[in-house]
Each structure stands twice: as structure tokens, then as C-alpha cells.
Amino acid sequence: MLGGHNGAGARHGRVAALAVAAGMWLASGAAAAGEIYLRGGFGLDRPGDTAFMDEDCSSTAPAALYGCGTGGDGAPYRSAGGFGTVPAVGLGLGYAAGAARFEALVEYRPAFAFRGRTNFLAPGRQQSVSANLSSVSGMLAGFVDLGAPGLPELGRLAPFVGAGIGVVRTRIGKTTMTFPTTTTTVPGGTRTGLAWMATAGVAVALGERVTLDLAWRYTDLGAVRTKRGPGRVVWRDGSQEPRPLDLAPTRARLAGHGVRLSLRYVMGGF
């Protein structure tokens, strides 16, 4: 299981690196003199459906949360669901020279949640799962403005494409699994790993120094990971004492499409 996640992450990282390199190559003919700018903005992401699964379903010490069996829906044991709509705020410091822009970008996703269901029981029975998350990412990005001579004109709109690669730190809080008579808690965790994005959008000049950007963005933040640690099972009617658990890590992928709206302010040139 873990090997599959790592392989996918490596492939995604190579794609991102090649995309950034291509952007830099396309922009290499830009003039040497340029302008420094600041960016501030916000956005919304809609990650794709995902599932938390054991890193090693055969682990016994610590114990795998799900194990290697097949659930009531015929799929491997897991918690399937989604992260809903994820808000993001971003700040960037960039350098623009001709058709090329290079930017150091930080994005913070202050609060979002996983909501899903396990498949230990038959479909239709109560087995909900929930957890709260946050993340912060830092990337180096390259953009190419496409409003070059010979291309179709879009009035005041200036199209652009870009890509970036960097690191992300994602935190997940305690996970709560609610069954018909019991509640299981799973320890949270943090993970630092590779992040990358690809984007395309349009820019509108609002003044001599201010530009509005509206963009589509695909962002891959890698894996969300619960750590090894103590969990427990509680019988809500008090019929039994809580049962402590020593649990192995689980993980799920966090990636999806979104939109960004931001302002660029040119501070000066050199």
C-alpha cells in the first residue's frame, strides 16, 4: 500500500518538475530587466474523493486500524469520503520580466474537514468518520504570459499558464469513527512532503501597478497521514470500560481542482 502511494507521489513530482522546467524554458527569451511584485489573494479547492487506508494492513504491533479484509461494500477496509470545499489564502513575492514571471508563493488552508464512512458494517448502517485539518504550503512557481504578437487578442484579458513545486505541511486532528453502539477515536498527525500545482488563467490590468488574476488551479498536496499512537473505543451506553488501542498510521491523498482570485501590485523595477 505504502509503495503505491510513494510511486504515485514520485510520478506526480516528476510531472510537476518537468512542467516548471518547460515554463522556464519558454520564458527564457524575456528581457533581463524586470519588476518586483507582491501578490495577495484567496481561493477555493475541491479535492477529489479519497479514502483513508492502512499504510500496512497486516501490522499487528501497532495494530492496523482497518486490516486486510474486505468490507460490506466489497472494497478493502477503508474510510471513503471527501474533504469538501477547502478555503485557501495566499501571499507571493514575484519577479516579472517580459513574458516570464517567477514567484515564491505561500498558501495557508486554515480549516477544512474530512467527512466519510467506513465499510466495516453492511451498507446503510451507521459508520461515519470525521476529522478536521489544516495545511500550509510553499512553492516556487513559474508563469508565462501568452499575450504575444500573433496570438488571438482577448481585449483587456491577458491569458497565462504556470506551474510550481514545493513542500507542504498538513495537520489532521483526532479522527472520530461513530458506529451504532461505539465511538472509536484515532490519533491525528502531521506530514511534510512534496506539493505541486499547475494553473491557467487570465489577468486584467486595473491600473499602472495593479493587476487582477483569475485562475484555475490543480493542486496536489500529497498524503494526509494519521500517526502511530493511542486510540480508544468507547461504548456510549457505558456498558463496558473504554478499550485502549495502539494504532498504526493511515493515509489518504489530498489533491484536486480549484480557483484563485488575487491581486498583483508592482513595487518597482530594476
Please name every model-derived segment.
Residues 35-37, 253-270:
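Outer-membrane beta-barrel "beta-signal"
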